[in-house]
UniProtKB/Swiss-Prot annotation:
It comes from the Bacteria. The gene is thrS. It comes from Yersinia enterocolitica serotype O:8 / biotype 1B (strain NCTC 13174 / 8081). This is Threonine--tRNA ligase. It catalyses: tRNA(Thr) + L-threonine + ATP = L-threonyl-tRNA(Thr) + AMP + diphosphate + H(+). The keyword tRNA-binding applies.
Length: 642
């Protein structure tokens, strides 16, 4: 006689085993109709699964995050159903859920085109519109293997042979004549899977191994209603317009080429943005009392063995050798900073010691994962490490948090999601040490009035951490900032200081990054601003233009005055119509265009126009210089009179 306890604390008793759907129906027909699955004692189960003993139950609907994920997973099965009807010889590999959608890897004897995707999507809609029931059957390992062997599904057979225990009972999900294998749960009926869109295809090696066969990966998105689907597709359309790779080419910021995969060739205008960003960070480092250091970009492998990186991270490290010694090109800056700390005897009076670097790092990312500035092999970290005592941890974390929000607000990021990752099962250090560290991080967030979620068990083995995730104008999440405590690395590299009692103690190390990778952050900003960088960041801040040759000398005088004031200005004296020049520089997203005609020459003024098309009228040149300097120095996100 199971007693079912619901989230509101109410209970329902039954004299026989009941399914999740039975309980939902008992509560009300509306909930039964919306029921996708259940969470029984914290574990997700199918709506058809039986509950045989006392349990805590939550009904999962499409409004829940888990419900949407289940719906997307079932759309992957729907894709399998449709593709097997259209091209029966296709062999199905894996079809998991990903952010905002799903994919399925398939082995098919044709190169899928956009026309094929349209045909496939149409068949998926035809099948989903039948609102058929999805039937789950738990079978023996052998029965599952026989089922897929008979259907010629070699990849499913391989999964069973290599990944699933012979004692297990896999779940087979029947979509009419189509059968797929999954841990589940899945939707009970295809009425939940009406709002989807197939997006693109790509190549993918079986099991991610380039030695295996190349499959075709079909990507799709799915949502619980049409409004959400359309909103997402609109966001994708807007994201495509803002793609930093496209804008980077339009604005001549940088390029990449095959001879240096994942490495950035910065052009003049892109490097101007980089240096301006670097200047801003330097100003903040001075304000928050950091030293700036510079470590070598490669060090002997022996050092990386001491840190544990060689054991755990070697596949991501580039190496080289010279004179019978092997060197690793650094993937991160922390070991180098410990070496600097170790030079000379340190006292507790020297702590906290805040050490920052614009560190040039390299990581051997898979070529298929590289993506413009967002995922590169060579990058610059705005990295810092704070060496302090245990008693100083809270104050230092507090300062890091203030610095994070101070810097993010300059760029206009207002929605920041914060997570605190706590001790994992495998860790170093005593429970007391972890408790104090976690409490210090939580207290620092609370003192700053910052809401956060815990991520239990997600901390590194050497300490808990805070993660800061930015949400941009399209509500995309970018994890950039981290504050990570480290109880391990200083000890591994023999870092110590003389304590108040004249004994040697190991400092606590705080890893702190705010922008993360400078390259990636510039990519994020490019998409956030759609290339319309605020004036202080814009590569060219002002273009001064003549209407006819008679104003050329005046244009050059005005341009020099702006340049002498420290404004990035250039003159456009080309023999082109003024409308053509304005259009060209507007497309280049230059913040201000100053136009000189005979009237401006006579009056000593200048006609001011913004890249958004706003005419500010004719203004005195000195007034323009002063106003522009005020906007630039304040790092305003807004132009004059906005």
């Amino acid at each position: 006689m199971p007693v079912i306890t619901l989230p509101d604390g109410s209970q329902r008793q039954y004299d026989h085993a009941v399914s999740v759907l039975d309980v939902a129906l008992d509560i009300g027909p509306g909930l039964a109709k919306a029921c996708i699955a259940g969470r029984v004692n914290g574990e997700l189960v199918d709506a058809s699964d039986l509950i045989e003993s006392d349990a805590q139950l939550a009904i999962i609907t499409a409004k829940d995050a888990e419900g949407l994920e289940i719906l997307r997973h079932s759309c992957a099965h729907l894709l399998g159903h449709a593709i097997k009807q259209l091209w029966p010889d296709t062999k199905m590999a894996i079809g998991p859920v990903i952010d905002n959608g799903f994919y399925y890897d398939v082995d098919i004897n044709r190169t899928l085109t956009q026309e094929d995707l349209d045909l496939l999507e149409k068949r998926m809609h035809e099948l989903a519109d039948k609102d058929y029931d999805v039937i789950k059957k738990k079978v023996s390992w052998q029965e599952a293997r026989d089922t897929f062997a008979a259907r010629g599904e070699d990849y499913k057979v391989a999964i069973l042979d290599e990944n699933i225990s012979r004692d297990d009972h896999p779940g087979l999900y029947h979509h009419e004549e189509y059968v797929d294998m999954c841990r589940g749960p899945h939707v009970p009926n295809m009425r939940f899977c009406h709002h989807f869109k197939l997006q693109k295809t790509s190549g993918a090696y079986w099991r991610g191994d380039s030695k295996n066969k190349m499959l075709q990966r079909i990507y799709g998105t799915a949502w619980s209603d049409k409004k959400q689907l359309n909103a997402y597709l609109q966001r994708l359309e807007e994201a495509a317009k803002r793609d930093h790779r496209k804008i980077g080419k339009q604005l001549d910021l940088y390029h990449m080429q095959e001879e240096a995969p994942g490495m950035v060739f910065w052009h003049n205008d892109g490097w101007t943005i980089f240096r301006e960003l670097e200047t801003f960070v330097r100003m903040k480092l001075k304000e928050y009392q950091y030293q700036e250091v510079k470590g070598p970009f490669m060090m002997d492998r022996v050092l990386w063995e001491k840190t544990g990186h060689w054991e755990n991270y070697a596949e991501h490290m580039f190496t080289t050798s010279s004179e019978n010694r092997e060197y690793c090109i650094k993937p991160m800056n922390c070991p180098g900073h410990v070496q600097i700390f170790n030079q000379g005897l340190k006292s507790y009076r020297d702590l906290p010691l805040r050490m920052a670097e614009f560190g040039s790092c390299h990581r051997n990312e898979p070529s298929g994962a590289l993506h413009g500035l967002m995922r590169v092999r060579g990058f610059t970290q705005d990295d810092a490490h704070i060496f302090c005592t245990e008693e100083q941890v809270r104050d230092e974390v507090n300062s890091c948090i203030k610095m994070v929000y101070d810097m993010y607000s300059t760029f206009g990021f207002e929605k920041i999601v914060v997570k605190l990752s706590t001790r994992p099962e495998k860790r170093i250090g005593s429970d007391d040490l972890w408790t104090r560290a976690e409490d210090d991080l939580a207290a620092a967030l609370t003192e700053n009035g910052i809401p956060f979620d815990y991520q239990p068990g997600e901390g590194a083995f050497y300490g808990p951490k805070i993660e800061f995730t930015l949400h941009d104008c399209l509500d995309r999440a970018w994890q950039c900032g981290t504050v990570q405590l480290d109880f391990s690395l200083p000890g591994r590299l023999s870092a110590s200081y003389i304590g108040e009692n004249n004994d040697r103690q190991v400092p606590v190390m705080i890893h702190r990054a705010i922008l993360g990778s400078m390259e990636r952050f510039i990519g994020i900003l490019t998409e956030e601003y759609a290339g319309f960088f605020p004036t202080w960041l814009a590569p060219v801040q002002v273009v001064v233009m003549n209407i006819t040759d008679s104003q050329s000398d005046y244009v050059q005088q005005v341009t020099k005055k702006l340049q002498d004031a420290g404004i990035r200005a250039k003159a456009d004296l080309r023999n082109e119509k003024i409308g053509f020049k304005i259009r060209e520089h507007t497309l280049r997203r230059v913040p201000y265009m100053l136009v000189c005609g005979d009237k401006e020459v006579e009056s000593g003024k200048i006609a001011v126009r913004t890249r958004r098309g706003k005419d500010l009228g004719s203004l005195d040149v000195n007034v323009v210089v002063d106003q522009l300097l005020a906007e630039i120095r304040s790092r305003s996100l807004h132009q004059l009179e906005e």
